[in-house]
Amino acid sequence: MKFILIAIGGAFGALFRYFVSKVFNTHFPFNYIPLGTVIVNVLGAFLLSFVLFSSIERFEVNPNFVLFFGTGFLGAFTTFSTFAYETLSLFLTSPFRALVYFFANLFFGFFAAFFGMVLGRGKFL
């Protein structure tokens, strides 16, 4: 049963990642860095942090929901492999753009996770 929840969540997460990346890369073209990947990674960092900290400190969350949404959906929605590939790809043409992209993912991802933690816990640190 757990594998099915993760697989279904993963299928939805992968489809949603494709949709979000396509929308941001098509309708909000920002040719300096691949914005779609930054958006999905930052949004995923926020959501996972929010859900996990909420479930630990404020609400009783069904463990099956955490498997479906956290492991399945958000695991497939966020993408470290695409981030790594795009960073190296950018590095070949513009090392500076690669650094901007790399640090944008890290900075905004950690900021989003921190913000998700604060909102999930309902208190600052």
UniProtKB/Swiss-Prot annotation:
Example GO biological process: cellular detoxification of fluoride
Signal peptide positions (record): none
Localization (cell): Cell inner membrane
Membrane listed as a keyword: yes
A GO molecular-function descriptor: metal ion binding
Catalysed transformations (reactions): fluoride(in) = fluoride(out)
Entry-linked Pfam families: CRCB (PF02537)
GO cellular component: plasma membrane
Transmembrane segments: 3-23, 33-53, 65-85, 99-119
Main location per the UniProt record: membrane
Function: Fluoride-specific ion channel. Important for reducing fluoride concentration in the cell, thus reducing its toxicity.
HAMAP family tied to this protein: FluC
Protein name: Fluoride-specific ion channel FluC
Species assigned in the record: Thermosipho melanesiensis (strain DSM 12029 / CIP 104789 / BI429)
Lineage: Bacteria, Thermotogati, Thermotogota, Thermotogae, Thermotogales
